[in-house]
Design a protein with these regions (language model features):
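Short, charged/polar, Gly/Pro-enriched secondary-structure boundary elements
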Residues: 21-24, 32, 89
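Conserved active-site tyrosine of GNAT-family acetyltransferases
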Residues: 1, 54, 88
């Protein structure tokens, strides 16, 4: 596809699409049934507001908002949170700091 690498780390890589990011990583788990998605992420300006909306809609938040730093090249400081979608998929909200 000709995408440039935005960041990489052991077991993962982010590709720059021009107006977004595609993250690919090895999660070490068994394959999902055809048509299922295990994880996807949304970039947002306000992770905490997204979590409030998720809770209000009645969905499970299983990683509360927190600040992290992915040891990628270059390093990636971010605020993240995870919830479960209606089909059990993991939905990540993140904001680069």
């Amino acid at each position: 596809l000709g995408l440039s690498v935005a960041r990489s780390w052991d077991g993962g890589i982010m590709f720059d699409t021009g107006d977004g990011i595609i993250e690919v990583f090895d999660d070490g788990e068994s394959p999902l049934p055809q048509g299922n998605i295990r994880h996807f992420a949304f970039a947002t300006e306000d992770v905490d507001a997204c979590v409030l909306a998720v809770r209000k809609a009645g969905y499970e938040v299983f990683v509360e908002p927190k600040d992290i730093e992915i040891q990628s090249d270059p390093k990636f400081p971010a605020r993240i949170a995870f919830c479960r979608g209606p089909l059990g998929e993991e939905i990540e909200f993140f904001c680069e700091k």
